[in-house]
Curated annotation (Swiss-Prot):
Listed name of the protein: Glutamyl-tRNA reductase
Protein family (similarity comment): Belongs to the glutamyl-tRNA reductase family.
Lineage: Bacteria, Pseudomonadati, Pseudomonadota, Gammaproteobacteria, Lysobacterales
Known partners and oligomeric status: Homodimer.
Gene3D superfamilies (alphabetical): Glutamyl-tRNA reductase, N-terminal domain, NAD(P)-binding Rossmann-like Domain
Organism: Xylella fastidiosa (strain Temecula1 / ATCC 700964)
PANTHER family hit by this protein: GLUTAMYL-TRNA REDUCTASE
Length: 432
């Protein structure tokens, strides 16, 4: 089996394609159920965020994964990257650490990777390989963030958006802010806004209890999502990040809000994929709409300031990739060693039981011991001897050289066991 990663992100695909590629809401568990039924796919996990959609799988057939992706999210082939084995391990480590993020070093992605791992476990698509890989990525991310400055003054898309809002509406203590959603992105935005002492904070969410909890934490007011349009006109700044499959803030609703506000400007941040706010809102006079792709330009300064820390983190990841692959290789070699030991102990126990039975029946001990010795020799060495003969006939020099390393011939010395075995296997039934 081979480890594969297929995906696209903000570097390979524009927002319109990332929107089409995403698995949000019920689409994610349905996709995992579908992957579980694919032949030759042992394990799978899906990571779907506003900036990336990635499929992690252990399979012998990468083309099957491409076909599955084309069936469920058509038209992405020219924007996909593919990583295999060590490259796949390296990619996940970089993603979890924040080195592959739009905001270099942002911490939110680690929580999203953990959510992906948890969802795959819940739906039975995670086995030992991916489980071990994902958990190791958590450790690598923690190590990199602890031992470099990549995590200093944590930055996220949410914090970048709040900083832009502060620049546009300074001070925030004279502004009303409306948050739509209650997920991690909105939670981060609420935290940064409360630190900026926003005058009034409104939180609308489909699950009202979650909105109430978030509002109580940050001194805000909770609204049912069904009343959203009634409060749009109150907001100077709007942040939206839900998992809705279609936009929930429309051009007509914002136009109505601007009319009520007597054309007082509204600043809107759409932090969702798929988008929460209709693109046409950005064409309205006095409505200023920023999307995730717009924020990429704003975070470029952060990327440069963290470059040195990122280089150190990259070195840590390279070391961790090597260690992880070395461990996998060692574990792969353990399997034949375990089979060899099992074969040896099973053969020993079987022939020893037969010998004891013969002794109990009064057969001479010398005769029983001799038969036991010959039986062990034949049983244990017949398979490798037969394999070496076939290798010699097929000119498989690699296997022959391996045998020479296992049984080196010293000057003037012939390995008695090997010599005896070859003679005996010619003359004796190996099952005797």
């Amino acid at each position: 089996m081979t480890l594969w990663v297929l995906g696209l992100n903000h570097q390979t695909a524009p927002m319109e394609l990332r929107e089409r590629a995403s698995f949000v809401g019920d689409a994610l568990p349905r996709a995992l159920d579908s992957l579980r039924n694919l032949p030759n796919v042992n394990e799978a996990a899906l990571l779907s965020t506003c900036n990336r959609t990635e499929l992690y799988a252990e399979t012998t057939n990468a083309q099957m994964l491409l076909n599955w992706l084309e069936q469920h999210r058509p038209g992405l082939q020219n924007h996909l990257y593919q990583y295999r084995d060590a490259a796949a391990v390296r990619h996940l480590f970089r993603v979890a650490t924040g080195l592959d993020s739009m905001v270099l070093g942002e911490s939110q992605i680690l929580g999203q990777v953990k959510d992906s791992w948890s969802m795959a476990r819940t739906h039975g698509t995670l086995g030992n390989t991916l489980d071990r890989l994902f958990q190791h990525s958590f450790s690598v991310a923690k190590h990199a963030r602890t031992n470099t400055r990549i995590g200093t003054n944590p930055v996220s898309i949410a914090s970048t958006a709040v900083r832009l809002a502060q620049d546009a509406f300074s001070p925030l203590n004279e502004s009303t802010v409306l948050l739509i959603g209650a997920g991690e992105t909105i939670q981060l935005a609420a935290k940064h806004l409360s630190e900026g002492r926003v005058q009034r904070l409104l939180i609308a969410n489909r699950t009202h209890a979650k909105a109430q909890m978030l509002a109580s934490q940050h001194g805000g007011y909770a609204l049912p999502l069904t009343e959203l349009n009634l409060h749009l006109a109150e907001a100077d700044i709007i942040f939206s990040a839900t998992a809705a499959p279609t936009p929930i803030v429309t051009q007509s609703n914002v136009e109505s809000a601007l009319h009520i506000r007597k054309r007082k400007p509204i600043l809107l941040f759409d932090l969702a994929i798929p988008r929460d706010i209709e693109t046409e809102v950005g064409t309205l006079t006095d409505a200023y709409l920023y999307t995730i792709d717009d924020l990429e330009r704003a975070v470029e300064e952060n990327r440069h300031s963290r470059r040195e820390a990122a280089e150190t983190a990259e070195a840590i990841i390279e070391l961790q990739v090597k260690r992880y692959m070395d461990t996998l290789q060692a574990q792969a070699h353990q399997a034949p060693l375990r089979r060899l030991r099992t074969f040896g102990t099973t053969t020993r126990d079987e022939l020893l039981t037969r010998a004891r039975r013969q002794l109990a029946n009064g057969r001479p001990a010398e005769e029983v011991l001799e038969q036991l010795a010959h039986g062990l020799t034949n049983r244990l060495l017949h398979p490798p001897t037969a394999a070496l003969r076939e290798a010699a006939l097929a000119n498989n020099t690699e296997l022959v050289r391996a045998a020479e390393q296992l049984f080196p011939e010293k000057p003037g010395y012939h390995h008695p066991t090997l010599q005896t075995t070859i003679v005996k296997t010619d003359e004796t039934d190996p099952a005797s």
